[in-house]
Structures are given as structure tokens and as C-alpha cells.
């Protein structure tokens, strides 16, 4: 896909994302955050000088990478780097936007910490299943693009925009941001219980209702348990629960339930998944 191949394009460079569960050996979290910030400087030194960099783009909570939240202190460092060099800080909220993390946008957590992004890219949940995407930015950034330069046949599609407006209405009317946080609280409590009980559950992390469970063969070595996750997906499907994997090693189950899910549905899913973990742990 274009999304997965974008880093291969000329002029696009990848820096390390803070994966604190798998931070470099021997480092404290504070030392690791410094290390990850310096990986940006390494790009400037080895690939492209800072004055030629237009933007730094990151997900507030990494999606395909394994549902890894960006540490706010690290984002503060990025904001400082961007301000020093005139670089735009762009939040890719295609997965994390529209209530998934307990706020309309996950980057609102950044804003509260004083490191607001310059631009937000969003799609997916924006229109409740109707194809729609959007770019949000400050007036001076949007006005810098000449009229007619960016557009497309279906830009401003009336049906999609109407769906997007209705989504915003429903989020506010049904208090879905509050519900997202409640779902997150329930799930984090349950998943952390599993972490305490099952050797195979290595890490639980997330924001709001967007949570990743990382499975390992051993909690000390943190060796990824990708095969276990593959079996878990099949075992759950056989019992009526659809789950999906993610992560660099394919060993993370990503939890991204609809914000309209009921507690009864949540508990039914928990029951199916925990019993599957129990059965597979005995193999």
C-alpha cells in the first residue's frame, strides 16, 4: 500500500519511535527518551540537514507499530526541535482521532502539555464508515497553499461531509468521549489483571479505548510470542470473537472497540479471550 511504502520514497526518512517496553538495554526511561530524541539529530546529520526538512510526522499513538503511545516528554523535545528549525510538527491521527483515546484527538494530550502540533491528518472514524479524510491546521499554514493546488474529484463530497457532521453530533450527544475513557478504564483493569496472572502477557499500554496487549514467551527476555498471537486470533475467532494483531514482531493484540459497545459485550469478549489464553498457555 502507499502508506506502508511511503518511507521508501525519496526525501522521506524514518527515525526511531520511543518503544519504552523495548528500550535499549541498560537505559532508564529518561535516558531512553534522550536517545530517541537524538535519533532525530542523527537524521539531520546523516540524511537531510534540518533546514531542508519540511515536517516531522508521527502518530500520537502508533497504530500498526503496536499501539505504542508517544511519551509526552519526548513530544515536548520534538516540539522544541521543530520550533528551532522551522519544521512543522504533524500528528497522524488517522487511527487515533475522533474519540478513540478519550479525547476528540489524541494530540490534545500534547496540547495540554504545551506541545500542540502544527497540523493534524485524520480519516477512518471521522465519518463513521463513509470514506472521508481531512487535514486540520493553523490559518497561516493553510493560507500558504495557493488556491486550486490541492484538490480532487471527490473533495468536499456532500454525503461524506454530512456523515462527518453527524459523527461529531453523536459523539457530543451520546457523551462518547466519556465512554471512551470508561471503556479504557474497564479494559486496562482487566488486561492488567491478565498481566499479573499470565506469563505470556508482557505489556499493556494505551490511551482511552485504544489499547495494545503485547505477548511474550518470557517476561524477563521479552522474546516476542508472534506464534502464540496467531493461534490466539484463530482460537478467539472459533469462539465468536474477532481480534487483530499489530506490532513490529506481530505479537501485539490491538484493542479498538466501537465506542458504542456495551459492558455486556465487553465482558463477553473478555471471557472468550481469557479462556483462549488459558487453553493456549497449557499447550
Identify what each model region corresponds to.
Residues 1-283:
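Conserved N-terminal phosphate-binding loop of PLP-dependent enzymes in the Aspartate aminotransferase
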Amino acid at each position: 500500500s502507499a502508506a506502508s511504502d511511503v518511507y521508501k520514497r525519496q526525501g522521506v526518512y524514518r527515525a526511531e519511535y520511543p518503544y519504552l517496553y523495548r528500550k535499549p538495554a541498560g537505559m532508564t526511561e529518561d535516558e531512553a527518551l534522550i536517545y530517541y530524541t537524538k535519533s532525530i539529530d542523527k537524521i539531520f546529520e546523516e540524511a537531510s540537514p534540518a533546514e531542508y526538512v519540511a515536517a516531522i510526522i508521527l502518530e500520537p499513538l502508533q497504530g500498526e507499530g503496536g499501539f505504542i503511545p508517544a511519551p509526552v516528554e519526548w513530544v515536548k523535545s520534538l516540539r522544541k526541535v521543530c520550533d528551532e528549525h522551522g519544521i512543522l510538527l504533524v500528528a497522524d491521527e488517522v487511527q487515533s482521532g475522533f474519540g478513540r483515546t478519550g479525547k476528540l484527538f489524541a494530540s490534545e494530550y500534547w496540547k495540554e502539555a504545551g506541545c500542540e502540533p502544527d497540523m493534524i491528518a485524520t480519516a477512518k472514524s471521522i465519518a463513521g464508515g463513509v470514506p472521508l479524510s481531512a487535514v486540520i491546521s493553523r490559518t497561516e499554514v493553510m493560507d500558504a497553499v495557493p488556491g486550486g493546488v490541492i484538490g480532487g474529484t471527490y473533495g468536499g463530497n456532500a454525503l461524506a461531509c454530512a456523515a462527518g457532521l453527524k459523527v461529531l453530533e453523536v459523539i457530543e450527544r451520546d457523551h462518547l468521549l466519556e465512554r471512551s475513557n470508561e471503556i479504557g478504564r474497564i479494559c486496562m483493569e482487566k488486561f492488567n489483571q491478565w498481566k499479573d496472572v499470565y506469563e505470556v502477557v508482557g505489556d499493556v499500554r494505551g490511551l482511552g479505548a485504544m489499547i495494545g496487549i503485547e505477548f511474550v514467551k518470557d517476561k524477563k527476555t521479552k522474546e516476542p510470542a508472534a506464534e502464540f498471537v496467531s493461534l490466539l486470533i484463530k482460537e478467539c475467532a472459533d469462539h465468536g470473537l474477532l481480534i487483530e494483531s499489530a506490532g513490529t514482531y506481530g505479537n501485539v493484540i490491538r484493542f479498538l472497540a466501537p465506542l458504542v459497545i456495551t459492558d455486556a459485550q465487553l465482558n463477553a469478549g473478555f471471557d472468550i479471550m481469557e479462556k483462549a489464553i488459558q487453553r493456549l498457555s497449557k499447550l
